């Protein structure tokens, strides 16, 4: 596999992860993007058919990633085995995901925050954990939308009404809002997800 250029804010693959590309005919980033998008469309169809409700667990989080990227990457659905430019040490990922799911249940039961705020916190935390080798932003956005619809009974977020996997103003604002959330300021992310 060739070296691909990554958009600003994307997590580069290490050589072992890059070797997990199942489609060896892919030579450009645009080809990779097309194949991944096709796989994500299949995952969306699977979600529409299955209407999952038991989603706050490691098994579902991993299954969703596998459905989104499993036709393209060998490691799809497997937690990362290397440290990245974001997220804690790779060996802490399973416990971090479990803690996130437990915390999300607690946030729901406490009813101290509006459902959108709970979903924003969930999304930010999942992105911060960065559980997979790649595809974390797309996975976290889709996982948050499933959380909104299946658990919180709210409509999906609009995510700036743009394709956030592509460079541009919306992606820049999204990443800036995530950085603000890192500092415990969720206002920009709350605004962004419903624009």
Segments from the language model and where they lie:
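FIC/Doc superfamily catalytic core
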Residues: 1-195
């Amino acid at each position: 596999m060739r070296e691909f250029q990554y958009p600003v804010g994307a997590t580069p693959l290490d050589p072992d992860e890059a070797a997990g590309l199942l489609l060896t005919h892919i030579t450009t980033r645009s080809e990779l993007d097309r194949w991944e998008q096709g796989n994500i469309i299949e995952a969306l169809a699977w979600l529409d058919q299955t209407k999952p409700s038991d989603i706050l667990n490691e098994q579902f989080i991993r299954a969703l990633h596998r459905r989104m990227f499993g036709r393209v990457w060998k490691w799809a659905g497997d937690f990362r085995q290397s440290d990245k430019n974001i997220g804690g040490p790779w060996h802490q990922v399973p416990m971090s995901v479990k803690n996130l799911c437990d915390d999300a249940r607690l946030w729901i039961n406490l009813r101290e925050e509006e459902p959108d705020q709970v979903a924003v916190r969930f999304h930010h935390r999942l992105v911060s954990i960065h559980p997979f080798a790649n595809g974390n932003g797309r996975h976290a956005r889709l996982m948050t939308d499933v959380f909104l619809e299946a658990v919180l009974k709210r409509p999906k977020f609009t995510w700036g009404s743009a394709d956030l996997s592509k460079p541009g103003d919306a992606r820049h604002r999204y990443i800036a809002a995530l950085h603000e959330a890192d500092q415990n300021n969720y206002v920009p992310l709350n605004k962004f997800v419903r624009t």
